[in-house]
C-alpha cells in the first residue's frame, strides 16, 4: 500500500482529494488541522506520529522533522543500500507529499501585523518536506497547489503518473518555496514602498511586496515613467488578471477597477483597435493590458492616446523609442503566466477576508441551453467572450459582447435591470450576434424583456433563480437563445 503525507494550510479540495486517494489504495498520514479536517469528513487518516513514534512538540513547531519522515521521502528506490537502511531502521517509503505552507504572505500583508505573528507563520517543516520530496521527484509525487489535485488523481487512475509529470510538479514546488522565502526576506528587510498618497490625496499609503514573481504587479519590470500610484496599481492588477484569461491576442482597457473595453483579434494591433472602439471615451486616462508584444505600429497608436499605464509581456526596441517620448506614461513588462492558486484578501474592521481568486471557468459543454432556440456559432462566440470578461466587472454587472469585443458595459448598479439599462443604452452596436451577459441570475423576467426590446437575441447567465422559468418563458416569447452556466461571478 502506498503512503501519502497530507499537511496543508489551504484546505480547499483536500477532503475530496484524500477520499480519492483512499479509493486508489493509499494510506494517509497527516498533522494538526489537516488531520482534523479529514477526520471530521470521516476520511481514514493516521497521525504522522505513528510514523515517527515521536509526539508533536513545542506547539507543533516540531512534528515532521524526523528521519522516519525524511528517510521515507528521500530514499532512492534504485539504490539497494538505501532500501536496506530503511529496512534496518524500520522506516516506510513515502510515495506522495501534499503540502502548502503557513500563510506568511497573508499574515504580513495585514496593516497591523507584529513581528511575533510573522515569525509564528514561518513554516519550517512544510518547506523541508516539499524540498525533500521535490528533490526525489523520480520516485515521489509532490503537490503544492490544490489546482493540481484532479490531474494527479486522473493520472493515477490511468497509470500516467510518470517521471516527466512529477518533474513538472517539482518545478512548481521550488518556485513556490522560492517565492515563500522571498516574502520572508522582504518583510524583515522592510520591502515596502511609500506611495505618494492612497486612493485620495488625504490618505497615506504604501505598497508592501510579498512576492517577486514576474507574473505579478509586484514583480513587474517598470521600463519607463514615474512611480505607480495607489490607483494605478489596483487598476493595473485588474487589467492584468483579465487579459491573462485570453489565449488569442487580447487588449483590455480599465478605468476605476472596471473594464471599459475588451477586444480580441488575429494580432495585437487588431485586438487593441477592438478594445478602443468598444468605448473610445472612457479609455482616456486608462490602463491598458496586452497579452502580446507591443510593436512599433501599436506603439504609434498608443502614443496618440492619453494613457496612464501600458502592460505587456514585451515591448520591441522600436516601440520603446516611440512610447518613452511621453514623459508620464508608465510601461510595465510582465510575464503572462496564469497562477490559479492565487488568493486575495480584503481588510474589514477587526480582521480580513481571504478567498481564492475567481479564475474558475465553465467549459462550453457544461453550459446548458434552456430555451427553445439554441445559439448560433457567432452567438456562442459572443457569449464565451463576454463570460470571460464578466468576473472583472463590479456587480451587479451586465455587459454586451460580440465575437471580437465588448460593446456595452453596465457595472456596479444596485439592481440588475439598472445595469442592463446602462449596457444597452451605451452599446456601440446591437444585432443578432451581440450577446447579453449577466454575472448573476435574473430574479425576475424584466431584464430579459428589456433586452428583447433592444433587439438582443442571445443571453448567457448563471441561472439558479426560483423564477428562472419566468425568464426562460420571456426569452422563448421573443425568440431569444438563453444559456445558463451554473456559476455566478459576483465582484464587490
Swiss-Prot record:
Pathway: Purine metabolism; IMP biosynthesis via de novo pathway; 5-formamido-1-(5-phospho-D-ribosyl)imidazole-4-carboxamide from 5-amino-1-(5-phospho-D-ribosyl)imidazole-4-carboxamide (10-formyl THF route): step 1/1; Purine metabolism; IMP biosynthesis via de novo pathway; IMP from 5-formamido-1-(5-phospho-D-ribosyl)imidazole-4-carboxamide: step 1/1
Assigned GO CC terms: cytosol
Domain of life assignment: Bacteria
Gene3D superfamilies noted in UniProt: 3.40.140.20, Methylglyoxal synthase-like domain (3.40.50.1380)
PROSITE patterns found in the cross-reference section: MGS
Any single Pfam family the record assigns to this protein: MGS
Entry's EC annotation: 2.1.2.3, 3.5.4.10
PANTHER family: BIFUNCTIONAL PURINE BIOSYNTHESIS PROTEIN ATIC, BIFUNCTIONAL PURINE BIOSYNTHESIS PROTEIN PURH
Name under which the protein is recorded: Bifunctional purine biosynthesis protein PurH
Record gene name: purH
Amino acid at each position: 500500500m502506498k503512503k501519502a503525507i497530507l499537511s496543508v494550510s489551504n484546505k480547499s479540495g483536500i477532503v475530496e482529494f484524500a477520499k480519492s486517494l483512499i479509493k486508489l489504495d493509499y494510506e494517509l498520514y497527516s498533522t494538526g488541522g489537516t488531520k482534523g479536517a479529514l477526520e471530521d469528513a470521516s476520511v481514514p487518516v493516521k497521525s504522522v506520529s505513528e510514523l515517527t513514534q515521536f509526539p508533536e512538540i513545542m506547539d507543533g513547531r516540531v512534528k515532521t522533522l524526523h528521519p522516519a519522515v525524511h528517510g521515507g521521502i528521500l530514499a532512492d528506490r534504485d539504490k539497494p543500500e538505501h532500501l536496506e537502511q530503511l529496512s534496518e531502521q524500520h522506516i516506510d517509503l513515502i510515495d506522495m507529499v501534499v503540502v502548502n505552507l503557513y500563510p506568511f504572505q497573508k499574515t504580513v500583508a495585514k496593516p497591523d501585523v507584529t513581528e511575533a505573528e510573522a515569525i509564528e507563520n514561518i513554516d519550517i517543516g512544510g518547506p523541508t518536506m516539499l524540498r525533500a520530496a521535490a528533490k526525489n521527484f523520480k520516485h515521489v509525487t509532490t503537490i503544492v497547489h490544490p489546482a493540481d489535485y484532479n490531474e494527479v488523481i486522473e493520472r493515477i487512475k490511468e497509470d500516467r503518473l510518470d517521471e516527466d509529470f512529477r518533474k513538472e510538479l517539482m518545478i512548481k514546488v521550488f518556485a513556490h518555496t522560492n517565492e515563500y522565502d522571498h516574502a520572508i526576506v522582504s518583510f524583515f528587510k522592510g520591502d515596502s514602498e511609500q506611495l505618494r498618497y492612497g486612493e485620495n490625496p488625504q490618505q497615506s499609503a504604501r505598497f508592501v511586496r510579498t512576492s517577486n514573481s514576474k507574473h505579478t504587479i509586484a514583480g513587474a519590470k517598470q521600463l519607463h515613467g514615474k512611480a505607480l500610484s495607489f490607483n494605478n496599481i489596483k487598476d493595473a492588477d485588474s487589467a492584468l488578471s483579465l487579459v491573462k484569461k485570453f489565449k488569442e491576442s487580447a487588449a483590455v482597457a480599465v478605468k476605476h477597477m472596471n473594464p471599459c473595453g475588451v477586444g480580441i483579434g488575429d494580432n495585437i494591433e487588431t485586438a487593441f483597435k477592438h478594445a478602443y472602439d468598444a468605448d473610445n471615451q472612457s479609455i482616456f486616462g486608462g490602463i491598458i493590458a496586452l497579452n502580446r508584444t507591443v510593436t512599433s505600429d501599436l506603439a504609434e497608436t498608443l502614443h496618440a492616446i492619453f494613457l496612464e499605464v501600458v502592460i505587456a509581456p514585451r515591448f520591441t526596441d522600436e516601440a520603446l523609442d516611440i512610447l518613452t517620448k511621453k514623459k508620464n506614461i508608465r510601461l510595465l513588462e510582465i510575464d503572462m503566466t496564469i497562477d490559479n492558486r492565487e488568493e486575495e484578501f480584503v481588510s474589514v474592521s477587526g480582521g480580513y477576508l481571504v478567498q481564492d481568486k475567481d479564475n474558475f471557468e465553465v467549459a462550453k459543454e457544461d453550459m446548458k441551453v434552456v430555451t427553445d432556440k439554441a445559439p448560433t456559432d457567432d452567438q456562442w462566440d459572443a457569449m464565451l467572450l463576454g463570460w470571460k470578461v464578466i468576473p472583472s466587472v463590479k456587480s451587479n454587472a451586465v455587459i454586451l459582447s460580440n465575437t471580437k469585443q465588448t460593446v456595452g458595459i453596465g457595472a456596479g448598479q444596485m439592481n440588475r435591470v439598472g445595469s442592463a439599462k446602462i449596457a444597452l443604452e451605451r452599446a456601440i452596436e446591437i444585432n443578432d450576434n451581440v450577446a447579453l451577459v449577466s454575472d448573476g441570475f435574473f430574479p425576475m423576467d424584466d431584464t430579459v424583456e428589456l433586452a428583447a426590446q433592444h433587439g438582443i437575441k442571445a443571453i448567457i447567465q448563471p441561472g439558479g433563480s426560483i423564477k428562472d422559468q419566468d425568464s426562460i418563458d420571456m426569452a422563448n416569447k421573443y425568440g431569444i437563445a438563453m444559456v445558463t452556466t451554473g456559476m455566478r461571478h459576483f465582484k464587490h
